[in-house]
Amino acid sequence: QAWGFNQLFKDVKLHDAPTLRSLMKEYLGGNTMYYRYHHGERLLSPEQQAWIKRLFARYCYSDIDFDNSCEELDFL
């Protein structure tokens, strides 16, 4: 699980940032959901993290990290 996007955008060129944010907002369900993931009110699934990393890779950004992450442990 992960949340927070400041680190994602720290090395992004100014002309790429609006497009990347817009595509992320669309994927995550709009402005409200984007900011919930950004502020940790919701956690990104591994699938969502992979999608975002692929999106950034399409714009030639490969070394990206989310602000926070944690592993969920399954206790049986």
What are these regions (language model features)?
Residues 66-76:
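Short, charged recognition helix plus adjacent turn
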Residues 29-45:
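Recognition helix of helix-turn-helix/homeodomain-like DNA-binding domains
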Residues 1-22, 62-66:
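A short, Lys/Arg-rich alpha-helix, primarily the initiator
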Residues 41-42, 59, 73:
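The DNA-recognition helices of helix-turn-helix-type DNA-binding domains
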Residues 15-16, 26, 44:
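Helix-turn-helix/winged-helix DNA-binding modules
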Residues 21-25, 53-56:
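The alpha-helix within a helix-turn-helix
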Residues 46-64:
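DNA major-groove recognition helix of helix-turn-helix/homeodomain DNA-binding modules
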